[in-house]
């Protein structure tokens, strides 16, 4: 089980997320290379709304299937891992009087040299977290990777 140097799923999802220009070209290139891609934005004081927004966007864009449990479950774990980075391990937002404004990227595909390894999913989050008062937030980042 060797990672393919040019198919590191976490790295690719982070680069897609942070790339501020030529977004459509980058998505087209990833899709040509066999990746399924989703980008979006979410802001909330509730972590469950962040999770729901990522899941809904991933289903609408075809990154995961709407029916069945396995793909949603893998996405959930990757999203929770990314949220741990954003919230520094404290998965609470509104109850701690903090809010997030995030851009997200979801990438699905096989990062390994062997096709037998199957698909993996990566969720990258970047944006701000802080008190629900404009100007009192700071940057935050998180990434999560899980097998499907």
Curated annotation (Swiss-Prot):
One of its GO terms (biological process) is L-histidine metabolic process. InterPro entries: Regulatory_HutP, Regulatory_HutP_bacillales, Regulatory_HutP_sf. It comes from the Bacteria. GO terms for molecular function: mRNA binding. CDD domains: HutP. Pfam families: HutP. Keywords: Activator, Histidine metabolism, RNA-binding, Transcription, Transcription regulation. Transmembrane segments: none annotated. Belongs to the HutP family. Antiterminator that binds to cis-acting regulatory sequences on the mRNA in the presence of histidine, thereby suppressing transcription termination and activating the hut operon for histidine utilization. Homohexamer. This is Hut operon positive regulatory protein. The lineage of its organism: Bacteria, Bacillati, Bacillota, Bacilli, Bacillales. The gene is hutP.
């Amino acid at each position: 089980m060797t990672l393919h140097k040019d198919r590191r799923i976490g790295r690719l999802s982070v680069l897609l997320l942070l790339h501020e220009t030529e977004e459509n070209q980058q998505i087209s290139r990833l899709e040509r290379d066999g990746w399924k891609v989703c980008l979006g934005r979410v802001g909330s004081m509730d972590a469950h709304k962040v999770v729901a927004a990522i899941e809904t966007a991933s289903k609408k864009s075809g990154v995961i299937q709407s029916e069945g449990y396995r793909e949603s479950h893998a996405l959930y774990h990757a999203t929770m891992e990314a949220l741990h980075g954003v919230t520094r391990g404290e998965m609470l937002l509104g109850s701690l009087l903090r809010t997030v404004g995030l851009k997200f990227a979801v990438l699905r595909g096989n990062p390994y040299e062997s096709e037998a390894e199957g698909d993996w999913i990566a969720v990258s989050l970047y944006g701000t977290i802080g008190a629900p008062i404009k100007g009192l937030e700071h940057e935050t980042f998180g990434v999560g990777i899980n097998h499907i």
